[in-house]
């Protein structure tokens, strides 16, 4: 098994409801370790940059508006197969399709306000981590 790092974000719908600790607890219970974390309130420009891959999708404007509507917690997680493990713990994007006990099934309000974001591949993990963190901010 490979020790790897992944990017994780707790979205504004969850921070507004004070769910940060409960979400981090679920991640840690799954064997993931937080090696970098900070609370940020994204500007529209930061949200547009972070989600640039979706710029041509019909939901892009709504996504940018939501992500810049309140604080988020951006994190780097580390553990065995961290990318797959984080995605498993998060659950399906649509909370209606998420397995019981997952973060999204437990906490998400809707497909748009689904509480968390996580990288889907090693390449996106590296890009997303670099978007928010310098190397000196990641402390294993």
Swiss-Prot record:
Catalytic residues (positions): 117 (pros-phosphohistidine intermediate)
Catalytic activity, reaction form: a 2'-deoxyribonucleoside 5'-diphosphate + ATP = a 2'-deoxyribonucleoside 5'-triphosphate + ADP; a ribonucleoside 5'-diphosphate + ATP = a ribonucleoside 5'-triphosphate + ADP
The keyword Nucleotide-binding is annotated on this UniProt entry: yes
Cofactor(s) required for function per UniProt: Mg(2+)
CDD domains, per the entry: NDPk_I (cd04413)
Alphabetical keyword list: ATP-binding, Cytoplasm, Kinase, Magnesium, Metal-binding, Nucleotide metabolism, Nucleotide-binding, Phosphoprotein, Transferase
PANTHER family named in the record: NUCLEOSIDE DIPHOSPHATE KINASE (PTHR11349)
HAMAP family linked: NDP_kinase
Protein name: Nucleoside diphosphate kinase
Organism this protein belongs to: Brucella canis (strain ATCC 23365 / NCTC 10854 / RM-666)
């Amino acid at each position: 098994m490979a020790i790897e790092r992944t990017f994780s974000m707790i979205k504004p719908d969850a921070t507004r409801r004070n769910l940060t600790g409960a979400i981090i607890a679920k991640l840690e219970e799954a064997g993931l370790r937080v090696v970098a974390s900070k609370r940020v309130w994204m500007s529209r420009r930061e949200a547009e940059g972070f989600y640039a891959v979706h710029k041509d999708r019909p939901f892009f404007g709504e996504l940018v508006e939501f992500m810049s509507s309140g604080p988020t917690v951006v994190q780097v997680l580390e553990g065995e197969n961290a990318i797959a493990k984080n995605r498993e713990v998060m659950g399906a994007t649509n909370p209606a399709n998420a397995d019981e006990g997952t973060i999204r099934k437990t906490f998400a309000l809707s497909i748009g306000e689904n509480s968390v974001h996580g990288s889907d591949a090693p390449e996106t993990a590296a890009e997303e981590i670099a978007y928010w963190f310098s190397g000196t901010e990641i402390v294993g």
